[in-house]
A protein has these predicted regions:
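RNA substrate-binding interface of SAM-dependent RNA methyltransferases
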Residues: 28, 38, 54, 93-185
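Short basic, glycine-rich beta-strand/loop surfaces that mediate nucleic-acid
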Residues: 67-82, 148-152, 193-201
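Structured adenosyl-cofactor binding patch, chiefly the S-adenosyl-L-methionine
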Residues: 24, 29-30, 124, 146-149, ...
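N-terminal positively charged helical leader segments and presequences
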Residues: 1-93
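Active-site/ligand-binding-proximal alpha/beta "capping" segment
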Residues: 178-227, 231
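Short, acidic/turn-prone active-site loops that include or flank metal/cofactor-
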Residues: 41, 61-64, 135-137, 203-205, ...
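Active-site helix-initiating loop/hinge in glycosyltransferases
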Residues: 19, 107, 114, 229-231
Length: 250
């Protein structure tokens, strides 16, 4: 990506988070906020920016919309250092010795709201990390950051070229693959008392044939109502908390 500057003096490599609460949290956490852009008055943001010695610049609403590619910025945008990505090996360093790691593998997930929500739940249950593809999938964006409510900075994420090969490598290290599909066995029939790679598929296509063939288990969520399926983030959230409940019962 090029380094040309725009009228605000930013380079094309600039990355943003937006929304009053998200920006406030980043400032309170002393995250690496480079600059704040505002089209509204917010005393808390202004106070925190002064405290952290972060430059604040007044711009109009249209400029913020152009910067973030959305009109849901609430008049407050922070320019931040690029979101950190980890290697798979770095993610594995966080696995405890009791054999109860949980990695969420996302197969060409496209909706940033789904990714953000999955990161938020992954943080809540203490997941080991999240892995997604470098291409044909959503990455770490401003929308993902906002929806994640800060989890984008706390959950270790890896972006890989080949999910199938990555899964094979994990299985060689003792991880078990649990795929998701409407035709799978009831998710409650699996104990999850092993290092688990939980695979969540694309919003429309589900998980790919290659990944499904490599799965040790394929599970589904029972649907007793009239709706046939659940949103990817909702399904992932139910499964993540179910695994947590099985591993850490009261």
């Amino acid at each position: 990506m090029g380094q040309s500057t725009d009228t605000l003096g930013r380079t094309s490599m600039a990355q943003f988070v937006y929304g009053k609460n998200v920006v406030k949290q980043m400032l309170m956490d002393n995250s690496k906020v480079k600059q704040i852009y505002m089209s509204v008055d917010d005393r808390d943001v202004e106070r925190l920016a002064r405290k952290q010695r972060v430059q604040l610049k007044r711009v109009d609403k249209k400029t913020l919309t152009q910067m973030t590619k959305t009109d849901r910025h609430q008049g407050v945008v922070a320019e931040v250092d690029p979101y950190r990505l980890y290697s798979v090996d770095e993610i594995l360093q966080g696995v405890s010795e009791n054999g109860k790691g949980l990695i969420i593998m996302l197969d060409e997930l496209e909706d940033p709201h789904n990714l953000g929500a999955i990161l938020r739940t992954a943080d809540a249950i203490g997941a080991t990390g999240v892995i997604f593809k470098k291409t044909n999938a959503v990455g770490l964006t401003a929308t993902v950051a906002k929806v994640s409510a800060g989890a984008i900075d706390t959950v270790k994420c890896a972006s890989v070229t080949n999910l199938s090969r990555t899964l094979e490598d994990l299985q060689k290290k003792g991880w078990w693959a649990v795929g998701t599909d409407m035709d799978g066995q009831d998710y409650r029939s699996v104990k999850y008392d092993f290092n688990t790679v939980l695979i969540i598929g694309n919003e429309g296509k589900g998980i790919s044939r290659l990944l499904r063939e490599k799965c040790d288990f394929v599970v589904s969520l029972p649907m007793r109502g009239k709706i046939e399926s659940l949103n990817a983030a909702v399904s992932a959230g139910i499964l993540m908390y179910s695994i947590y409940n099985m591993r850490f019962p009261l």
